Amino acid sequence: MKSFGSDHSKSGRDIGKKKGTSGNSTTNSKKNTESSLGGNTKVDSTSQSTSQGSSSGDSLSREERLARFRKSSSSVIGLDSMIEDRKEEGILKTNAVHMEAPFGKPIEEVYEGVHTGPVLGTGLSGLVRLVAHKATGVKYAVKCLDLGLIDTEEELARLREEICIMCKLDHPNIVRLEEVYESHNEIYLVQELCPGGELFDRLDEQPGYRYTEAECARLVKQMLSAVRYLHSKGIIHRDLKLENFLFSSKAKDSDLKMIDFGLSKHFRKGEVHHDAVGTPYTVAPEVIKGSYDERCDLWAIGVLTFLLLTGDAPFGGCGGPEPLTKVRDNILSATYAFEPADIWESVSESARSFISSLLVVDPRKRPTATEAQKLPWLTEWAEKSRSEADNAINPKVVKALVKFKELSDIRRLLCEVLSFTLLPEQIKDLRKEFEKMDIDGSGEISLWALKEVLLTNAAAGSLGTMSEQEVEDIFNAMRVKKTETRIHWHEFIAAALSQCKIDDRNLRLAFDRLDSDHKGYITLDDIMNLLGKDGLPREDVMREMWGDSMKEVNHETQTHITFEDFALLINKAQAQDSDMGLPTWFILSLHEWLDTFLPMDNDDNNNNTKQVMPCIMCSPTSLANIFPFHC
């Protein structure tokens, strides 16, 4: 298991004395230690975010190790075969993660600061740096893994597993993997940047080094949603801790993002795992014993809830004076107390009950993530914080969803790819709307939930009339892969794209994602490769839709789409919220401009009033004269 205490000097509630982290960090360094929690349970020294192993004194040279791993593949980790496998699967959220062909375009040509950018964190096998996309200026975190420090096939398999897992994840509270590059010496994982910093550091800033119960409940709710999502996809995290949750922004009400899947693993229901991994202060007793399943993640949530409410870890292990053997004994017997009294007397009984239900030694008696979401503490606080506005769906978003189903499959696909390029500030309003529809807290939207929300709002008169069939049509249009039973986070964003302020940065990033081999244009094959064989409509249908797209950009005989063509197609796809074909955000901006510059008239009472003029948005003819490119 990873050693936490070796790097962080923090005793009791002195959480503010944490050392060795950067303010904007996405990782923490951990010393290579042979400490143990007693018995034969060895501490895994793998680092939090570059968790792929350390040098073990192998007699092979660096070059010999890399050559051994490459074998028949040109890639150490088999990146080329992973690219081919994804084409078969047909999962857009997976294929949308760009994997540069081994030794293809160097990452240094795409990003500024790969080797010189500010270090956000360090680990045993590399660094995490802040970089900027050269063409757009968008900032990302790049995890640079030194392949020369990977000694065993097991460590290599763990790295492959991390990449495969991150490619499949699409949840508002889980960090997004954007791109993967490989050089002769390193693997680069380009990830969404979370400038809000670690939950560990944010806790350090709280009065008394602890959160209020209301804020703690908000954060735990997000953690559980991410854990439930992982488990529903057959993934166990195995290293949940404060450092592995980042805030997406510096705002006080910022959402959490789960990170670091270096120890994560796929599992089958009922499967038992035996390798001892994790962090001493959050590790579950069954992990120490060497026989566990996905419910070890729920134990960690119980520990984190306790810690957020008090600043203390219930069993020690947070760099305090207690030896790891004592921490081990406390965990194995679930020995902890709701102390000191001056803190816990202000904490509700339902919060204590929530923690107690998770910190149960027998994992079979521990609730699942879904069951934990329904425990009274979370439901009570959710009800207290809910307002009427939390139930009302924005009619403009619903209108966007209705219009989305009228687009062709290719148009919808382009919107989906574009959705992965949006920054947090561009989708913060959609995040709220998504949460209203995610009524079961799964991080996805079921057909039942969509019907419940839309039909209830329609009945209340806020959406006009709407039938069950219309809701089903909306649901089916949002699903990229028709065998899926739920709508994913970015599928929702794609459908409501017209509510976002799209700019040239997004268009360029999306175009480059489609033009994965850097031709300078997009072909039908690029589209088909992105969808994969299993995700494709019939090929003749795709070719017909492609031909229609060509007509829309006035290229009936052309076989490819340039960046300018792509921008025009996206503009038309987004133009769905007004009869003139202009997106809502543009109309609102235009109204604001008119409000600023319209001349003033004086009425009989000498009060300044705006001159009454016809709105150009009500006059398609005048609009065509102003914006001829749109018609």
Placement of each model-derived feature along the sequence:
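Conserved N-lobe beta3->alphaC-helix segment of eukaryotic protein kinase catalytic domains
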Residues: 144-169
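Activation segment signature within eukaryotic-like protein kinase domains
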Residues: 219-220
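Protein kinase glycine-rich loop
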Residues: 116-124, 128
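Glycine-rich ATP phosphate-binding loop
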Residues: 127-148
